Amino acid sequence: MKEDIKGFIAETAFADPREIQEDTLLFEEGIFDSMGLLNLISFLEENYGVRTDDTDLVEDNFRNLRAIEDFVSRKKS
């Protein structure tokens, strides 16, 4: 899952996937913006069946790859 999400982020942000590590701060390092987040949410819904509501839209859930993976795992269980 992590590599798929990383690949999606790299592709949509025109970033080198090697620069995106598990703890890379996606927003603070300018890799991600609000449009990128919307695209990611759609990707997670389509590929992992994760439904996101307004209370989920906090930076802690999407701060880095580790946080995104944890978020998906929580939502799927």
What feature does the model see in each segment?
Residues 1, 23, 61-64:
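Short, conserved alpha-helical segments within structured domains
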Residues 1-18, 70-77:
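Thiotemplate assembly-line natural product biosynthesis machinery
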Residues 13-31, 50-58:
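Phosphopantetheine carrier-protein modules
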Residues 34-41, 65, 69:
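Amphipathic alpha-helical interaction surfaces in cytosolic regulatory modules
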Residues 53-76:
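C-terminal structural segments of small proteins and small subunits
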